[in-house]
Design a protein with these regions (language model features):
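Intrinsically disordered, low-complexity regulatory segments enriched in Ser/Thr/Pro
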Residues: 1-12, 16-19, 23, 86-143
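Short, flexible helical or helix-coil boundary motifs
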Residues: 17, 21-24, 28, 57, ...
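Amphipathic alpha-helical segments
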Residues: 45-72
């Protein structure tokens, strides 16, 4: 990749974007995945690498803001309605359920029409999912935290601040 003139020491989040743009340019995903089958295999591996860190990001919110009243759940890799793949991690808690709003969600998805997979929240847009090792998954923890936190912020707008147990203490 002699034409890739990016600085050698990019921060992790910019390395992900760099890889994303190169994959789009070169028509591949990862090292050499071109076929949908190979890309889906890499997606399943990425979900496996990401699982611990997605749970951690949600559990941090559960422990600190939801006062450990929430439940983290994960689906594993599933076939989506459009024929692609999806895997979700959710954090539900009593106040959220009472108000019938979405849980905090981290979703890895690979739409059937996409070149490669992405991450998103229930209310937050897309981020490239270019994870091929446990170290790369760990480096995504700040992104997962940002998606989960932004999702919670947006859920407060859908309801109000009273869905956050830690805010209601000593009130």
């Amino acid at each position: 990749m002699a034409s890739d003139t990016f600085p050698a020491a990019l921060p992790a989040h910019l390395q992900v974007l760099r890889r994303h743009f190169i994959d789009l340019r070169d028509g591949r995903h990862g090292d050499n995945a071109v076929s949908r089958e190979d890309k889906e295999r890499l997606f399943a591996e990425a979900v496996s690498f990401l699982d611990l860190h997605a749970r951690q990001a949600l559990e941090e919110i559960n422990q600190s803001l939801l006062l450990a009243t929430g439940t983290v759940m994960a689906t594993g890799v599933l076939r989506s309605a459009d024929g692609g793949l999806t895997a979700t991690w959710t954090l539900s808690w009593p106040e959220q359920l009472e108000r019938r709003i979405s849980p905090i969600t981290l979703e890895a998805f690979f739409s059937s029409s996409f070149h490669h997979p992405h991450l998103r929240g229930a209310t937050v847009g897309n981020w490239p999912l270019n994870i091929f090792s446990s170290d790369e998954a760990e480096a995504e923890l700040p992104i997962l935290r940002a998606i989960a936190s932004a999702d919670l912020h947006n859920l407060v707008f859908q309801s109000d601040y009273r869905i956050i147990p830690a805010i209601m203490i000593n009130r």
